[in-house]
């Protein structure tokens, strides 16, 4: 599922857009306070940012500038401010598109899909040759590393395939437990850590200095390669 970060202080609008986009396979996480939105952008991995400009405590143009300096993420400005100078500054600060309010949510959906298509094409051109280190066979519930089958328990398969499904995305321990069928959702964080440790022993050259399964302090884990 596509993950969109929204920074919008109009809660009613945010809820309306979130419900509409979810019907089209796009999950939206909204923050109505810009500093928490910036923190989320820097600690989580999203496919796209939908950003309002008129925000409390910090102007959206500055939010755009800060996030685009720290993260490579497509940005759509969604704002009632239609001044040409705002549009120019937003694009200069890293925005990819500018959609003046009010607008039809179907137009927003079309712009999101178009921007993500362009973004993915760029990734395909620049993706290094090691992009296919891992391969998941969902029918046989097996994971291959460099085309060699890994000997995994059911829980190990579920966690590793989850991490592979969204490379670079930070999964909390709680979400890992919820998404893994064989793990009790109420399992302790320690239980998840133990399984991660076993996985590292099977895929890492040096489990104590992992290069694939990376710990994100205070949150959980992500897969990088």
From Swiss-Prot:
Give a GO biological-process term: positive regulation of DNA-templated transcription
**Gene Ontology molecular function: any one:** transcription cis-regulatory region binding
The Response regulatory domain covers which part of the protein? 3-116
Coiled-coil positions are none
SUPFAM superfamilies in the record:
C-terminal effector domain of the bipartite response regulators (SSF46894), CheY-like (SSF52172)
- Post-translational modification 4-aspartylphosphate, affected residues: 52
Work out whether the entry's keyword set contains Ubl conjugation.
Answer: no
Q: How is it modified after translation?
A: Phosphorylated on Asp-52 by ArsS.
Which GO cellular component terms are attached?
cytosol; protein-DNA complex
Which keywords does this chain's UniProt record carry?
DNA-binding, Phosphoprotein, Transcription, Transcription regulation, Two-component regulatory system
Mind listing where the DNA-binding region sits, in residue ranges? 123-225
- Say what the protein does: Member of the two-component regulatory system ArsS/ArsR that regulates genes involved in biofilm formation and acid adaptation by acting on major ammonia-producing pathways. Upon phosphorylation by ArsS, functions as a transcription regulator by direct binding to promoter regions of target genes including ureA, amiE and amiF to positively regulate their expression in response to acidic pH. Negatively autoregulates its expression.
Q: Which PANTHER family match?
A: REGULATOR OF RPOS
Protein name per UniProt: Transcriptional regulatory protein ArsR
């Amino acid at each position: 599922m596509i993950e969109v970060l929204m920074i919008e202080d109009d809660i009613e609008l945010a809820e309306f857009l979130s419900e509409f986009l979810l019907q089209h396979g796009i999950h939206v996480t909204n923050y109505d306070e810009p500093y928490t939105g910036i923190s989320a952008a820097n600690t989580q991995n999203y496919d796209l940012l939908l950003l309002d400009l008129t925000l409390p405590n910090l102007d959206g143009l500055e939010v755009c500038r800060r996030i685009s300096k720290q993260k490579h993420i497509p940005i759509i400005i969604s704002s009632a401010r239609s001044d040409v100078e705002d549009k120019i500054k937003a694009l200069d600060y890293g925005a990819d598109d500018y959609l003046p309010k009010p607008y039809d949510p179907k137009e927003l959906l079309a712009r999101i899909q178009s921007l993500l298509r362009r973004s993915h094409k760029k990734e395909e051109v620049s993706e290094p040759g090691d992009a296919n280190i891992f391969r998941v066979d969902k029918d046989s519930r097996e994971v291959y590393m460099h085309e060699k089958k890994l000997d995994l328990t059911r829980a190990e398969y579920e966690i590793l395939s989850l991490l592979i499904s969204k490379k670079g995305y930070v999964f909390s321990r709680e979400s890992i437990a919820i998404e893994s069928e064989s793990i009790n959702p109420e399992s302790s964080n320690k239980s998840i850590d133990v399984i991660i440790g076993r996985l590292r022993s099977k895929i890492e050259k040096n489990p104590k200095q992992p290069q694939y399964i990376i710990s994100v302090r205070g949150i959980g884990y992500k897969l990088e390669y």
